[in-house]
Amino acid sequence: MVRGDVYLVDLNPTKGTEIKKTRPAVIISPDEMNRTLKTVIIAPLTSTIRIFPFRTDCTFQRKKGQIALDQIRSLDKKRLIKKVGNFSSPKINNILEKLSMIFSP
């Protein structure tokens, strides 16, 4: 399990406007965390296209969608159902750049 892997994850139960249901999500936590903790940080994928500055377009399994960086969360690894793919290094770098903008002062 490494940064950039895409897993089918169970995001239920949720509250309010949190992205829900079982869906693909990309692991964004660093590999050291992924090896040592029982949790991972993920960003869910969605097929609903929104013009938000902190979403990044993607194509996964031949479907166009977005990575919802405004919906990142920490999950117990028990919520990971199965690995369904991964993203390339350029896409991961794009994700990390956007996350840096989110968390910079």
What is the role of each PLM region?
Residues 1-105:
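Conserved functional hotspots at enzyme active or ligand-binding sites that engage polyanionic ligands
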